[in-house]
Amino acid sequence: MQEKPQEPKVVGVEILEKSGLDIKKLVDKLVKATAAEFTTYYYYTILRMHLTGMEGEGLKEIAEDARLEDRLHFELMTQRIYELGGGLPRDIRQLADISACSDAYLPENWKDPKEILKVLLEAEQCAIRTWKEVCDMTYGKDPRTYDLAQRILQEEIEHEAWFLELLYGRPSGHFRRSSPGNAPYSKK
């Protein structure tokens, strides 16, 4: 009977454990946060399609920016999860079930763009809380994950500001991206 090969020593993980970081807990948090980015991308696709009429049509590009940037966040952090020895669930239904944020369902009154904006805002606020927790968990212990998480956090804060501006007429400093999904902080 042949012995199973020994797992390789991963210095990049070993140094994080020596700094006091619980890798298993971190990977679990990252998988849930990354699942939220993926499900948000999916739901934002549906929400964007329902931004119709004179008022809704102007909101589509902003929703599209947030949607594409969330997909980029998913791709960016997935790489880190695997570097840390983790992985994503093999079943997409399981991925959706473990999401750190609730589903961004299309509201019943979807013909009112403000109702869709409220759903978008709630999703961004959950993402902000989630990525802040990752930043707190990794600050001073895991510079790579911290860097990725804080870049994602900056974009989620921008998304929140956009939706607050649109819902409440609050100044946000929103600027038009050079192209939809051109994430200034987390692009690869």
UniProtKB/Swiss-Prot annotation:
Enzyme class at the top of the EC tree: oxidoreductase
Induction remark: Up-regulated in cultures grown in iron-depleted media and upon hydrogen peroxide stress, but is not induced by other stress.
GO molecular function: ferric iron binding; ferroxidase activity; heme binding; iron ion binding
CDD domains given in the database record: DPSL
Compartments it resides in: Cytoplasm, Nucleoid
GO BP terms in the entry: intracellular iron ion homeostasis
Function of the protein: Protects DNA from oxidative damage by sequestering intracellular Fe(2+) ion and storing it in the form of Fe(3+) oxyhydroxide mineral. One hydrogen peroxide oxidizes two Fe(2+) ions, which prevents hydroxyl radical production by the Fenton reaction. In vitro, it efficiently oxidizes Fe(2+) in the presence of hydrogen peroxide and stores it as a mineral core.
Record-linked NCBIfam families: Arch_DPS, PRK13456.1
UniProt similarity note: Belongs to the Dps family.
Name of the protein in question: DNA protection during starvation protein
Species: Saccharolobus solfataricus (strain ATCC 35092 / DSM 1617 / JCM 11322 / P2)
Gene: dps
